[in-house]
Amino acid sequence: MADNFATNPGSGGSTFASDDVGGVQYPRIKIAVGPDGVANDGYTPFKLQSAATTNATSVKTSAGEVGLIVAFNVATSVRYLKFYNKASAPTVGTDVPVLVLPIPASSNGFVISPSEGIAFSTGIALAITGAVGDTDTTAVAANDVVLSLAYA
């Protein structure tokens, strides 16, 4: 028997990838990540070393997901990583974050690797501020925070 098979042959059906092993069709499956309706071959890395600002940044200008967050803070006070569901850099203090993560002080940090990515339906944007409030615009110091993401 041949590899691959068609559904509704002759009627414009779809072809599915398979492997013929001893006359039995075993499906071939490609593992891909991404939000519903999107598939790619893996995550894209992103790195940010904080500037002396709120670090308002657009990571991805379309729907996506974050599959890994690694944050490290050398400052003596907590810093706050804020995620926004938008296709451009946030207006910090005006836009409302959808996720706020405290980054522990004094050379501490965290690693978050969810079993399923954190989905953003519009885009992936972020900021890093000195206080937790949604309207906070406290800039962090240069090199306070090192952030790495993996996104799709």
Named regions from a protein language model:
Residues M1-V70, T76-R79, T138-A139, N143-D144, ...:
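Extended, low-complexity segments enriched in Ser/Thr/Gly and acidic residues that occur primarily
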Residues G67-I69, G117-T135:
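Noncatalytic modules at the cell exterior or secretory-pathway interfaces
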Residues N73, N85, I128-G130:
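Residues on the solvent-exposed faces and adjacent turns
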Residues A75-D95:
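Short, surface-exposed beta-strand/strand-loop-strand elements in extracellular ectodomains
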Residues K86-A89, D134-T135, A150-A152:
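A generic "folded-domain core" signal
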Residues L101-N108:
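Short proline/glycine- and polar residue-rich coil/turn motifs
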Residues N108-E116:
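Exposed aromatic-hydrophobic patches
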